[in-house]
A protein has these predicted regions:
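TPR alpha-solenoid repeat register
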Residues: 141, 175, 216-218, 253, ...
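TPR/TPR-like alpha-solenoid helical repeat scaffolds
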Residues: 180-181, 218-227, 259-263, 285-305
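Short coil turns that delineate tetratricopeptide repeat
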Residues: 136, 170, 212-213, 248, ...
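Active-site-proximal alpha-helical
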Residues: 1-52, 206
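Alpha-helical adaptor scaffolds
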Residues: 113, 147, 177-189, 193, ...
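Canonical positions in the second alpha-helix
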Residues: 131, 164-165, 206-207, 242-243, ...
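TPR/TPR-like (Sel1-like) alpha-helical repeat modules
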Residues: 196-205, 262, 267-285
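Beta/coil-rich, acidic/histidine-enriched accessory regions frequently appended to metallopeptidases
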Residues: 47-188, 269-272, 290-314
Length: 314
């Protein structure tokens, strides 16, 4: 419950931390004597309490809770929740064998998604190019190349590879995404901003027609206004908030939504989103800034939005 302790843990300590965290979550959900306490903890967090204070308010004596957890861990039986299959709606599941090129490119795709440093990006794109040269007609291979090129900073090459992928498969989601990423990065330096961003949003608009509930087109439709220092349309703002509903785990997206809500003086909604950021144990500087803004929102009657935005962006 203490983010400060979390930050000082070793790698071994982190393993123990996550294990104990899941044990605590499981116990609070199924313990009759602790019924409702997890909801109370979440409520205290939403009121602006830090994790420790919220925990003390909800759980009481930490020593007693820890002893109960130790006993729960040693118990031979754990309570579970059964969900009958009739209560689930399962869509069609299709499985196929990877094509040869896809299999060869799988390591590149995994490393791209996991993230690489600048040196690793240059190494990865060389490998991706060699594979892509052997499988020029495989759209998945070309879209994976596009991703590697973008990560390496090669926007023009990423766009070319995306186009090759889309020429073979006009429903390749990753190809649209990588093309959009590259065009948006190019647009930052374009002399004709209006034309550049109109071109940049096109792949995301095309993706939106294929996947209406994909969050990235909704997010980038908002970004194009902000990047040009224009006031976002109501449709763009609503789309941004819908994107957060679709991807609530995305801290960067939540931050963007909170900024927009502060600009619009919708402080109640901004508080909800900032609360989720403020006490995130992984939050770093953003968590500290969010806590400061929350204090201002709750302690002052006439808050200047520009001052709050400045705090968050510092």
């Amino acid at each position: 419950l203490d983010p400060q302790t979390f930050g000082s843990l070793s790698s071994r300590g982190l393993d123990s931390f996550y294990g104990r965290s899941w044990l605590l979550y499981h116990y609070l959900n199924f313990s009759k004597s602790r019924k409702g306490q997890l909801n109370e903890y979440q409520h205290q967090i939403s009121l602006g309490q830090n994790s420790l204070a919220a925990g003390k308010a909800a759980f009481g004596d930490f020593g007693k809770l820890d002893r109960e957890l130790r006993s729960y861990l040693k118990s031979r039986k754990l309570t579970g929740l059964s969900i009958r299959k009739e209560a689930l709606t399962i869509g069609n599941v299709a499985v196929r064998q990877l094509r040869e090129g896809e299999a060869k490119m799988m390591d590149v795709r995994m490393r791209s998604r996991r993230g690489v440093n600048p040196a690793g990006a240059l190494e990865l794109v060389v490998k991706a190019r060699k594979i892509a040269d052997r499988y020029p007609d495989d759209p998945s291979v070309q879209s994976a190349l596009a991703e590697a090129e973008f990560i390496a900073g090669n926007d023009a090459a990423a766009i070319i590879a995306s186009n090759l992928a889309l020429a073979k498969d006009d429903k390749d989601v990753n190809a649209y995404v990588q093309k959009g990423y590259a065009l948006f990065r190019q647009a930052r330096e374009a002399k004709d901003q209006a034309t550049a961003y109109k071109k940049a949003i096109a792949p995301f608009l095309a993706l939106n027609k294929i996947e209406n509930d994909h969050p990235l087109p909704l997010m980038y439709n908002h970004i194009r206004f902000v990047a040009q220092k224009k006031a976002p349309s109501r449709n763009a703002i609503e789309g941004l908030e819908r994107a957060l509903e679709l991807a609530p785990f995305d801290r960067g997206l939540r931050f963007r939504v909170a900024l927009q809500q502060i600009k619009d003086r919708r402080y109640d909604w901004a508080e909800r989103n900032l609360s989720a950021l403020a006490f995130d144990p992984h939050g770093g500087k953003l968590s500290v800034a969010s806590q400061e803004v929350l204090k201002r929102l709750r302690g002052e009657k006439n808050v200047d939005p520009s001052e709050l935005i400045k705090i968050l962006k510092e």
